[in-house]
Amino acid sequence: MEVGLSPSACLRRIKLMEQAGVIRGYTALVDPTQSESTIAVIINITLERQTEEYLDKFEAAVRKHPEIRECYLMTGGSDYMLRVDVENAGAFERIHKEVLSTLPGVLRIHSSFSIRNVLAGRLKAKR
């Protein structure tokens, strides 16, 4: 793909976007067939209450656990959706016992193991 800029001008624009916060970070999409295999576990969390106090405490606790890779406040049947990556069921059991079940205000935890990744890291479509 051509952008009509010299490499140095392109790098300068990237640096400016990083400094302005337009580019917040970078992600490596690792092919699980080329690395140690991990399993994505999607976890739906229902809180006892959905008050600002409960939401704030839950979110603060989630941020303290690097095992939790993603966390979304949701509409629908669950309050939050989390993602963790584990090597096996035993590793997930540890996270369930030591992390998920200790999060404040949790009423229900529902976990689903992915079978395989169908689509990840898609860039925003051009319009």
UniProtKB/Swiss-Prot annotation:
Residues 1-46 form the HTH asnC-type domain. GO terms for cellular component: cytosol. It comes from the Bacteria. Keywords: DNA-binding, Plasmid, Transcription, Transcription regulation. One of its GO terms (molecular function) is sequence-specific DNA binding. PROSITE patterns: HTH_ASNC_2. Not known, symbiotically active. This is Uncharacterized HTH-type transcriptional regulator y4sM. It comes from Sinorhizobium fredii (strain NBRC 101917 / NGR234).
